[in-house]
Amino acid sequence: MEITDVRIRKIDSEGKMKAVVSVTFDNEFVVHDIKVIESQNGLFIAMPSRKAPDGEFRDIAHPINAETRSKIQTAILDKYESICAGSTETEGNN
């Protein structure tokens, strides 16, 4: 499965969330609402989640192995860093 598009919407506020991202796979399937979060250890991604009735947050969609998570995170963070350098609000691969 190939990542064919990454669209980033930067969040210009003081919080830890820096961007909301949509990733398209094989020009056929898109996952919205992936978040770019800043922590003490640097940037990471958080997959889209929903609050369950018990108060826990559960991922709606997520990679099932570390290799795929790394591939998605690298694509998102590379794109995020490139648009931050160019200060563009929203950008995709198109």
From Swiss-Prot:
Gene behind the chain: spoVG
Main function: Could be involved in septation.
Assigned keywords, A-Z: Cell cycle, Cell division, Septation
Species name: Acetivibrio thermocellus (strain ATCC 27405 / DSM 1237 / JCM 9322 / NBRC 103400 / NCIMB 10682 / NRRL B-4536 / VPI 7372) (Clostridium thermocellum)
An example Gene Ontology biological process: sporulation resulting in formation of a cellular spore
Record-stated family: Belongs to the SpoVG family.
Name the record gives this protein: Putative septation protein SpoVG
Signal peptide: none
